[in-house]
Amino acid sequence: MRCPKCGGSKSSVIDSRQAEDGNTIRRRRECEDCQHRFTTYERVEERTLVVVKKDGTREQFSRDKIFNGIIRSAQKRPVSSDEIEALVNRIEQKVRSSSDNEISSDFIGNLVMDELAELDEITYVRFASVYRSFKDVGELESLLQQITKGVKKKREE
């Protein structure tokens, strides 16, 4: 494993433990050249999934793409990277549990939106505004009304 700081190829594992999702091993490493400490994650290599986009093009499934999209939506919000990592793990697990090797981008986007609605409403709205490509303020307004109705129902329960 190359050191992200100096590029050295020799590192030793200081700590190794199972991550919260149960499917990943978290390893704490130390570079033998510069003593920089960094974290790596090890997980089982899964079958290749293909995402079919709205325009019909296909690309390989990327959990990093989901993670980065959520990170952008959650900027300056009280959402930790651990919460986002757990959310992405749940989404990936749902996608991989599907029997199909091809998954629509709509299916993935809806999974992300469902998870974000539970995590943080502002992050949800930010993600939705990009994902759904709102044409005007009216579309955004109707989404906000749906969220408001959902919040009222939760408070009544």
From Swiss-Prot:
The keyword Lipid biosynthesis belongs to this UniProt entry's keyword annotation: no
Cofactor(s) the protein needs: Zn(2+)
Basic and acidic residues bias spans: 17-26
Keywords from the UniProt entry: ATP-binding, DNA-binding, Metal-binding, Nucleotide-binding, Repressor, Transcription, Transcription regulation, Zinc, Zinc-finger
GO terms under biological process: negative regulation of DNA-templated transcription
One Pfam family matching this protein: Zn_ribbon_NrdR
Cofactor notes: Binds 1 zinc ion.
Zinc finger (unnamed): 3-34
InterPro entries named among the record's database cross-references: ATP-cone_dom, NrdR-like_N, RNR_NrdR-like
Region (Disordered): 1-26
Residue runs in coiled coils: none
Gene Ontology terms, MF aspect: ATP binding; DNA binding; zinc ion binding
ATP-cone domain location: 49-139
Superkingdom, natural source: Bacteria
HAMAP family according to UniProt: NrdR (MF_00440)
Function: Negatively regulates transcription of bacterial ribonucleotide reductase nrd genes and operons by binding to NrdR-boxes.
Annotated family: Belongs to the NrdR family.
Record protein name field: Transcriptional repressor NrdR
